[in-house]
Regions:
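Hydrophobic transmembrane alpha-helices and their immediate loop junctions
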Residues: 1-161
């Protein structure tokens, strides 16, 4: 039996802060224990994704968009936005917040001296950037070309998140 629990942004803020804290501690410890470098690299890649998602969410909250939060602690998407209720301008603000966050994250890691931790994190962040281009950019371009806000609701969100 699966128990569905209503959670707000505070739960995910705490969850993600723990992920980032473990990541930073692993990064710090990777100087003396190589295995921690792998954990740190994967954690930094996950942090890139979380940074991207939180940028979307904070922009959605700022735009007063209607959002539904995930119900499972392991949800990969923090929320699903009801895009039919927002303006085109709000849609662009929310979309570009995630794009900009990913760009900042990539620039940050490109500015660091090369290391194994940085290499793993950068690879994962680049994968995120490619996925963003494949899945999110076409939606934003479609909104630019047409005069409508495209559906951005995540299909089956309630079932998987």
């Amino acid at each position: 039996m699966v128990v569905i629990v209503k959670r707000g942004w505070q739960f995910y803020a705490l969850r993600d802060a723990v992920i980032v804290a473990v990541t930073l501690l692993s990064w710090w410890g990777s100087q003396s224990i190589e295995t921690l470098g792998i954990i740190a690299g994967v954690g930094l890649g996950m942090s890139a994704y979380l940074f991207h998602e939180w940028a979307h969410l904070l922009a959605a909250i700022r735009q007063k968009a209607s959002v539904g939060f995930a119900t499972r602690w392991y949800a990969i998407f923090l929320f699903s936005m009801r895009s039919g209720m927002i303006s085109k301008r709000a849609f662009f603000d929310i979309s570009f917040a995630g794009f900009f966050a990913t760009l900042l994250y990539l620039l940050f890691f490109l500015s660091l001296p090369p290391s194994n931790v940085q290499a793993v994190a950068l690879l994962l962040a680049q994968c995120l950037a490619v996925l963003t281009l494949i899945f999110e950019a076409p939606i934003a371009i479609w909104a630019m070309v047409t005069d409508r806000v495209p559906a951005a609701d995540i299909p089956f969100f309630d079932r998987f998140c």
